[in-house]
Swiss-Prot record:
Catalyzes the transfer of the AMP portion of ATP to flavin mononucleotide (FMN) to produce flavin adenine dinucleotide (FAD) coenzyme. Belongs to the archaeal FAD synthase family. It comes from the Archaea. This is FAD synthase. It holds the Pfam family CTP_transf_like.
Length: 142
């Protein structure tokens, strides 16, 4: 059995998130998703929704076998517990694939790191980022 981990913020779910999770699930037999804690998101605006609400939404998706909120201090502790065969990064996540692979190896986690492909919707006007969704809401609501 191939165990896969995907990770991210998953704030205001959109089709890009679904694409990422479906693709990651298709690379193995079991998909575990680790959601970044609001307080640990420092590379962009913090999530709008609370940790547990985001986890609940992701856990409800068909491709997902388990969804957990990440550790308070150490992002690799949940990965150690899951002990995946594969960790799949989102196509636009800021993490460097090589740096993640090195950090996993330093902890003795034998895990391949891949990057998911970009989602290409088959329709016009798709809004594929939380930031753009928020902008659209602000533009259309007074």
């Amino acid at each position: 059995m191939t165990t896969v981990v995907a990770q991210g913020t998953f704030d205001l779910l959109h089709p890009g998130h679904l694409h990422y999770l479906r693709e990651a699930a298709g690379m193995g037999d079991q998909l575990h998703v680790i959601l970044a804690r609001r307080e640990n998101v420092t590379h962009k605006d913090p999530p709008i929704l609370p940790n547990e609400q985001r986890r609940e939404m992701v856990a409800a998706l068909d491709p997902v076998d388990e969804a957990i909120v990440g550790h308070d201090d150490d992002i690799f502790i949940p990965v150690e517990r899951i002990d995946p065969d594969l960790l799949v990064l989102g196509y636009d996540q800021h993490h460097d694939r090589g740096d993640i692979a090195d950090a996993l190896a330093e902890r003795g986690i034998d895990c391949v790191v891949r990057r998911a492909s970009e989602y290409e919707p088959g329709y016009e006007g798709a809004v594929l980022s939380t930031g753009r969704i928020v902008e659209r809401i602000l533009e259309t609501r007074d």
